[in-house]
């Protein structure tokens, strides 16, 4: 299917870091300053210009180093405004981020929605919307990077804004699938589709390959439109799966409890271990303590003294293993991802003779791992985005390894199915988005019940809906 471009054209961002606002290469005085003396501008026009430059600086710096590493000093120097001017306009950097995000998300949602409603059928509407988004991403890659990744690590208000934007897009697609937004709260299809599209887009934006998205719009549309408009019987609402976004459930484990589960494994006291075993134990305790603290307080609340105290090691021992708290975080992230991939691979390989059964076993094992290791799951799938670009690179490498188990699906696909080349990558993104959803909303205890539906959504583009549904029902029956 060839994507038809929408009739609308993406509007140029008034406050994006475009060439007409810059001079020279990236540097300390990148954005133009107002002329000194009489310039004929009203106070309102001056403030509008200053706000625009600060938003542009925030967009650029987040794309470069991530939100936690952005300082107000960096913002004022890059935007060419004074600190007093900054604080006259914004209370803090979070308020500036929210302002930039609202501008980008509002324009993006409006542009994509306009393209979507111009289609004559669901398949065409979705593809037109993807083309519209790809055009914006190519025109404003740094702004789109902020929209997809920049809110992580910025606090609950930023995540709340992001969730509202995601829900608006989900509702648009859900309505286009000729379904009531509230009629089937257990259907994860729309979240899965949004996750796949977001993953493909975010990866290319972060890697400086935004121009590829326009060419991929048709493939993503074909992938998304391969899913039937209704879930097969026996999957919708089965095993008590819920996809709602109404916050933590009454039985969800709070952050402190997630941390204590990890902390409870930490040994202490005298021992007769060899030096190598001691070092291994210390490293494991530091990793587990890091995951426990981040589960409770987030990356921003992570401190070396608390890591050392909970891990029952000295500060000197900590520094022998990790130079900074960021390195400890990356160490914990690698351990969590390695464990998740290991249990997935072992389950997959045990049933590899029948690829679809191996995938089902792997997804079931992955969801079981997430449920049993809530602190590590939260760190690797949620907190990673707000830590640093290095953490996101580690995540992308792990996701690429996970995608490798899906690629044989192209070979196993029936002759009548021609899955687009982007399918494996998009499906992997969809799986991780659903995991992210359950973890973020403190619903990990329900995730194992979602495994059959995840299996169906994973297999459908490769095997078709019949075998995908049969495999998913078999998994659901085995858990009864």
Regions found by a protein language model. Name each.
Residues 1-38, 171, 175, 203-276, ...:
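C-terminal peripheral helix-coil segments that are non-catalytic and often amphipathic
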